[in-house]
Amino acid sequence: SVFNLSQFIFFVFVCLATIALVSLLFPHLFTRQKKFYPKRVITAFESRMFTRLKEAFPHHHILAQVAFSALITHDQMNMRNQFNRKVTDFVVLDRDYNVLTIIELDDPSHIGKEQEDAERDAMLIAAGYTVIRYTQIPSIRQLQRDLR
């Protein structure tokens, strides 16, 4: 016979040991991949701005991470595709839920993206919104002055 019993047992043992070693070294091969993961809604920097906006405008509604598609639309699909994945940092609403202004908080990740930011602002401005950009968290007084 090609294999005697001891060779067969050794072969099975080596196969099982190999499978065990591969599963230890590469567990992702044997576990089901998660398709969705939770993530933070806003950064720590943005959360400080959110708190400042709530302090500056206690009688207004402050929304964070609002999709452009909730704010603007266009008849042509190719134009909608230009903004359908874009999100604005904050939207300030009055008591009747009308948009007063859109606020963008530019952290250091925006350096070198000034043209892209200008294009984003232009879309919102063309729809009739006011857009205010800050690179630092402004004082309550500054916010109230800017949103008059």
Q: Language-model segments: which ranges?
A:
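Basic, glycine-rich
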Residues: 3-15, 19-23, 128-148
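Functionally constrained cores in energy, signaling, and assembly domains
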Residues: 5, 52, 60, 88, ...
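A generic structural signal for short, solvent-exposed coil/turn residues
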Residues: 54-56, 60, 82, 123-126
